Each structure stands twice: as structure tokens, then as C-alpha cells.
Amino acid sequence: MRVPKKERQTELQHTIEQNPFITDEALATHFNVSIQTIRLDRMEMKIPELRERIKHVATERLDDVRTLTENEVIGDMIDLKLDTSAISILEILPEHAFSRNAIARGHILFAQANSLAIALIDDELALTTKANVQFTRSVHVGERVVAKAFVSSHRQDGRSDINVESFVGDECVFIGEFTVYRSSKEESK
């Protein structure tokens, strides 16, 4: 059963405030309307498209990345607390995948996780010294990969252990344990 436009728009506003990363497709399914209707509602209410919402959230939640430039981070960084945790989102595009089966190349998922682990370090120089990774399912073109990283320990030798898990929806698709060297041992906690 369709909801009246005013009521739908009020609910749409609330839904996007609760989850700014929700897609127009998911909203259309939720409200049982077309994607075009959702886009028209968003335009009428001056709610930006998903990519702009992600950038807006990112500017509010990011510490300054010290180890990498913005274009060296694979995916869109949406949350960063240096030496603590970070989150990035990567939309899998055709150029990220094998052409014959539209499955994302493993090095793309690894690069997203590795760059997130490096960006997490509060130092001018950070390098991956060890990585133990597991791919738990194939990721396909059009899927959105959310990588979540957190520092599990800071060692006396100036290295940090970082765990990264990547998800498509609620399903884990990648698990990585990274050891990252930092150049300033005295800054490690």
C-alpha cells in the first residue's frame, strides 16, 4: 500500500537522517515506489544524492589523514579516528572486476583494506609489514563494499596491529589482519 506523498517525504527525510548511506534503490523498495519517485522527492526536499551525502558525512567525521593523500586511499573514507578506527566505502565498478564474470579482483578489496589500515596510523610514514587476509565470498560489479578497520594493539617496537573487515550489506566478504610499521616509535601508544 502506497503512503501519501507528504507522509512518504517525511519518512524519507527521517530514513536518510538515520542512514545517510542508503541507496535510492533501497529507498524505492522500502517505500514501494519507483526510483524516479525517490529521486524527485529528494530533489524537491533538497536532499543530495548518495555520493554527496557520503562526502558530507566524511567531512564531519574525519581526522586529518597523515600517511596518505586523499587520492591514495582506495574508496571513500567516511570515518577516521586516528590510531583507533576508520571506515571506507567502495562501489565496485566494471574496471574493478574481471570482464568475463563481473567479479571484483582480489587486489581491489585488498587495496581498500590496506589503504584504510595505513590511513589509520597517526604518523607521517606508515608501511604494511605483514598481512593475513581471507576472502569469504565473491564481490560483484554494482555492489558496495564497506570496510571497517580498528587498531587492536600498539606494540613497543613501533608497529600496530590492525583488523579490517569488509562487508556487502550484512555479509562479510573480506577479513584482514595487518601489521603496520610507523616511523615514530615514541608516538605509538
Swiss-Prot record:
State if DNA-binding is listed as a keyword.
yes
> What biological processes does GO assign it?
fatty acid biosynthetic process; negative regulation of DNA-templated transcription; negative regulation of fatty acid biosynthetic process
The UniProt function text for this chain reads: Transcriptional factor involved in regulation of membrane lipid biosynthesis by repressing genes involved in fatty acid and phospholipid metabolism.
From the UniProt record, list the coiled-coil ranges.
Answer: none
Q: Does the keyword Lipoprotein apply?
A: no
Q: Which gene encodes it?
A: fapR
What name does the UniProt record give this protein?
Transcription factor FapR
Q: Keywords for this entry?
A: DNA-binding, Fatty acid biosynthesis, Fatty acid metabolism, Lipid biosynthesis, Lipid metabolism, Repressor, Transcription, Transcription regulation
Q: Which InterPro entries match?
A: HotDog_dom_sf, Transcription_factor_FapR, WH-like_DNA-bd_sf
Q: Which family is it part of? A: Belongs to the FapR family.
What highest taxon heads this organism's lineage? Bacteria
Checking NCBIfam families in the record gives: PRK04424.1
